[in-house]
Swiss-Prot record:
Alphabetical keyword list: Chloroplast, Coiled coil, Plastid, Thylakoid, Transit peptide
Feature: transit peptide: 1-50
Keyword Coiled coil attributed: yes
GO cellular component: chloroplast; chloroplast thylakoid; chloroplast thylakoid membrane; cytosol; plastoglobule
Coiled-coil residue spans: 63-87
Principal location listed in the UniProt entry: plastid
Name of the encoding gene: PAP4
Name assigned to this protein: Probable plastid-lipid-associated protein 4, chloroplastic
Keyword Plastid: yes
Localization per Swiss-Prot or TrEMBL: Plastid, Chloroplast thylakoid
Similarity comment: family membership: Belongs to the PAP/fibrillin family.
Length: 242
């Protein structure tokens, strides 16, 4: 059987680099093969490539730490920009644009790729910024606006609840239907005025909500009307009453 040309010529193929090397092994007086200068050089090349690989591809824990630091930095920039805007009530168009740009940077490093399959979504979240005029009610006198708004989502029971605090303590509960691993269709069912007077929601009380970022501390969502919602975790143990 004919030998491959590389064996006929004494050429060796490096599996790591794909380059051909020519050379042979010399035998010592003891009968054991000893490496030639070329073989020693090849060993040095392999060591150099190994060192390069270590620095070109850092260990996984370094990459994870880098991502975590980036997320922390972007979140902090967003929260600092939101802080003086009274949940968005005093935000100018330029403020809204800047917040949206910062929010998109945070969304780009979302650590939870399928939020609706994660327990991180569950619990009571406090609204800290929104562009929704119906929630902010900025045209009303300040004493008639809700001081704090909460939203709860239970992915296990497919329920949603929005709550206001002082002065009216209004709330609304509804059902959610997953459209994919990030987005839900929302159908509101019952309003409670002053916290205890139930009113059935109209059939038109529908919408969609996409969770664009979530971790243990922060959640960003976008509605089907283009509104941005930014919430911080208030109580991870809270569950919507059935």
């Amino acid at each position: 059987m004919a030998l491959p040309s590389c064996l006929k010529t004494g050429a060796l193929m490096s599996p790591a680099t794909g380059f051909n090397f020519s050379g042979s092994l010399m035998k010592s007086d003891s009968g054991f093969a000893v490496p030639t200068k070329l073989q020693s050089t090849r060993k040095g090349d392999r060591e150099r490539l190994r060192v390069q690989a270590i620095f070109s591809f850092p260990p996984a824990f370094l990459t994870r730490n880098g991502r975590a630091e980036k997320q922390k930095q972007l979140k902090q920039e967003l929260l600092e920009a939101i802080e003086p805007l009274e949940r968005g009530a005093t935000a100018s168009p330029d403020d809204q644009l800047r917040i949206d740009q910062l929010a998109r940077k945070v969304e780009a490093v979302n650590p939870t790729k399928e939020p609706l399959k994660s327990d991180l979504v569950n619990g009571k979240w406090e609204l800290i910024y929104t562009t929704s005029a119906s929630i902010l009610q900025a045209k009303k006198p300040r004493f008639l606006r809700s001081i704090t708004n909460y939203q709860s989502i239970n992915v296990d029971t497919l329920k949603v609840q929005n709550m206001e605090t002082w002065p009216f303590y209004n709330s609304v509960t509804g059902d959610i239907k997953p459209l994919n691993s990030k987005k839900v269709a929302v159908k509101l069912q019952v309003f409670k005025i002053l916290g205890f007077i139930p009113i059935k929601a109209p059939d038109s009380a529908r919408g969609e909500l996409e969770i664009t970022y979530v971790d243990e501390e922060l959640r960003l969502s976008r509605g089907d009307k283009g509104n941005l919602f930014i919430l911080k975790m208030f109580d991870p143990t809270y569950r919507i009453p059935l």
